Structure formats: structure tokens, C-alpha cells
């Protein structure tokens, strides 16, 4: 199993690479790529960690060598948010980066599963899809927007609020991956009751948690370490599913035939070909149903923006 990380020299990429080096199954290959000259050195640094995962690093303008034979490609390349920016401010820079890297994946590893971390995910995933379609290699089962950070934040905040073990907390998160498009389904957390006030406080905290980190870092970065952990959780789940482990479910932003939008995050059963089955997200509370309906205009506009970017 070969996993490639594109954008591996950045804050998310390095955290993700560390977790993959220590947690990928024995015999896996890990390939790191970034335009930054430091990238081969990041690989050398990680190579000193004693695990049965081989690692190589590549720098420069062409990721081809990193992508040859890749089964999974995780893309975190791009610029990060700074105070005062929202995810849409990132669009002009990151859209072009994703377009180029998706094109390289189409050319070098057309059968790989691709997980997009680069924001704005609501838009960068449709960009990748359009590029893959133009190349004639699009398989909607193999393209994912990694929204796992919204899930782990939800689990953490619920655990803290209710004083319960994280082992007992599962929170499905549907919709998209920015602001009001992030919808944690708190009504579905088993064994936990929330007051209307708790839901009204917790939901926006989850939606705006990225801004909380950006502001706390005072211009020194965005959520890199927690995002690295979230991407590793998703990537490792995907690897296990590709290797035949059954029953692995993660929430992710996919082209899954949703009645709401072309791309929509919801629980997905992963399998040997990527998406095995898009699962129903169950019954919503009145608050959640209203929030879902209210987000759709923004989510659809984000998707259209990506499609039109590739169409030119």
C-alpha cells in the first residue's frame, strides 16, 4: 500500500506524515511531496523513526515521482488561513494548486483514491472532480473531501461539555466543511440529551472552531496539528478498507447522489474501491433540518464556483 502526501512540508503535511509513519500497516510505503526544498529532509527525519514503513521525499515543481504507484493521495498543499480571512479568501490561490495536482494524479496514478484537505474543501473537491472528468478517469467512489476535523472537534466538545468518555461519543457531521455548511447531528449522539441552549451554543462553536484556532495562534498559523490528526484518521480508515477490512464508516464530503447537492458530507461505508455505500444520515431534529435547508444555497454556490473555475 503506497500513500502519497502532497503538501508534506506544511504544518498539516508534517503532522500527517508523522502519524502515517507511525501508524500505517507494516510494509506500507509513504511518499512525501512539496515544492519546498526541505521535503526530502522531512522524509529523512521521519525515516529515523523505527516502524516498518518505508519513506521517501520529493521537492520541486513536479510531483510525478511521488505519485508513481500511489494507492492513496492525500492533498494538503496550499496556503493557510490568517486572521481576518475566511476559507473563501483562500480560493484564488488554492484553486489553482488543486487543479494542477489533480491533473498530475489523473496522469500518473489515475486509479488512486484522492483525499482533499486543502481549503475551501466545499470548492476544491468539485475542482478535482472536474479535472478528473476532463481526463476521463473520474471515479466518484475514489474522491473525498476530508471533513474529519469537524467530527473530531464535535466529539471533543461534546465529551468536554457532558463530562463523558470520548470512547462513548460519536457525532455524525453532514453538509460541507465551512461555517454554516458544517452541521453536527447532536440529536444522534447516543445516550446524551442536549438542551436547546446547549445545541444553540455548541453548533456554532463547532462551525467556527477553525477561526478559534486562527485567532489563538495570533497570525502564526491555522489548525495544523488537529487537522493532521483528522486527516490521518481518515487516511488510515481508508487504507484499512482498501485492504479488505469491513464495516469502516467515516463522514466525508463526496459525490454520493445526495438529494441536497452534488457534493455532500455524510456517513460513508468504505471498501476495497473507496466508497462502498453512502449511508443515510437518519432523522434530523427540527433545528437540524432547518439548519440543513438554510445551508444549501451557500453549499451549492461553493460547488458551482469550483466547477466554473475548471470550465474557465
Swiss-Prot record:
Keywords: NAD, Oxidoreductase, Tricarboxylic acid cycle. NAD(+) binds at residues 7-13, 34, 94, 117-119, 227. Disulfide bonds: none annotated. Substrate binds at residues 81, 87, 119, 153. The keyword Mitochondrion does not apply. The active site is at residue 177. Gene3D superfamilies: Lactate dehydrogenase/glycoside hydrolase, family 4, C-terminal, NAD(P)-binding Rossmann-like Domain. It catalyses: (S)-malate + NAD(+) = oxaloacetate + NADH + H(+). One of its GO terms (biological process) is tricarboxylic acid cycle. GO terms for cellular component: cytoplasm. Its EC number is 1.1.1.37. GO terms for molecular function: L-malate dehydrogenase (NAD+) activity. Belongs to the LDH/MDH superfamily. MDH type 1 family. Catalyzes the reversible oxidation of malate to oxaloacetate. Homodimer. This is Malate dehydrogenase. It comes from Moritella japonica.
Amino acid at each position: 500500500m503506497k500513500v502519497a502526501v502532497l503538501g508534506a512540508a506544511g504544518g498539516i503535511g508534517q503532522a500527517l506524515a508523522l502519524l502515517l509513519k507511525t501508524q500505517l500497516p507494516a510494509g506500507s510505503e509513504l511518499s512525501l511531496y512539496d515544492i519546498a526544498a526541505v521535503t526530502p529532509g522531512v522524509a529523512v527525519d521521519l525515516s529515523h523513526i523505527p516502524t516498518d514503513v518505508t519513506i521517501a521525499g520529493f521537492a520541486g515543481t513536479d510531483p510525478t515521482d511521488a505519485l508513481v504507484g500511489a494507492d492513496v493521495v492525500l492533498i494538503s498543499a496550499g496556503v493557510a488561513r490568517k486572521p481576518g480571512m475566511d476559507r473563501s479568501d483562500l480560493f484564488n490561490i488554492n484553486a489553482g494548486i488543486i487543479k494542477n495536482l489533480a491533473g498530475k494524479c489523473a496522469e500518473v496514478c489515475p486509479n488512486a483514491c484522492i483525499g482533499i484537505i486543502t481549503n475551501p474543501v466545499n470548492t476544491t473537491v468539485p475542482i478535482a472532480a472536474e479535472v478528473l472528468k476532463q481526463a476521463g478517469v473520474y471515479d466518484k467512489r475514489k474522491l473525498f473531501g476530508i471533513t474529519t476535523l469537524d467530527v473530531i472537534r464535535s466529539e471533543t466538545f461534546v465529551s468536554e461539555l457532558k463530562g463523558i468518555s470520548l470512547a462513548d461519543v460519536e457525532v455524525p457531521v453532514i453538509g460541507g466543511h465551512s461555517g454554516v455548511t458544517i452541521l453536527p447531528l447532536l440529536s444522534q449522539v447516543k445516550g446524551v440529551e442536549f438542551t436547546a441552549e446547549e445545541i444553540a451554543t455548541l453548533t456554532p462553536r463547532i462551525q467556527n472552531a477553525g477561526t478559534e484556532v486562527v485567532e489563538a495562534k495570533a497570525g502564526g498559523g491555522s489548525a495544523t496539528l488537529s487537522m493532521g490528526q483528522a486527516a490521518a484518521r481518515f487516511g488510515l480508515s481508508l487504507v484499512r478498507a482498501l485492504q479488505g477490512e469491513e464495516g469502516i464508516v467515516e463522514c466525508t464530503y463526496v459525490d454520493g447522489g445526495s438529494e441536497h447537492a452534488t457534493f455532500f458530507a455524510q456517513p460513508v461505508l468504505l471498501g476495497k474501491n473507496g466508497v462502498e455505500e453512502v449511508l443515510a444520515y437518519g432523522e434530523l431534529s427540527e433545528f437540524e433540518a432547518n439548519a440543513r435547508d438554510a445551508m444549501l444555497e451557500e453549499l451549492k454556490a461553493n460547488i458551482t464556483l469550483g466547477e466554473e473555475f475548471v470550465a474557465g
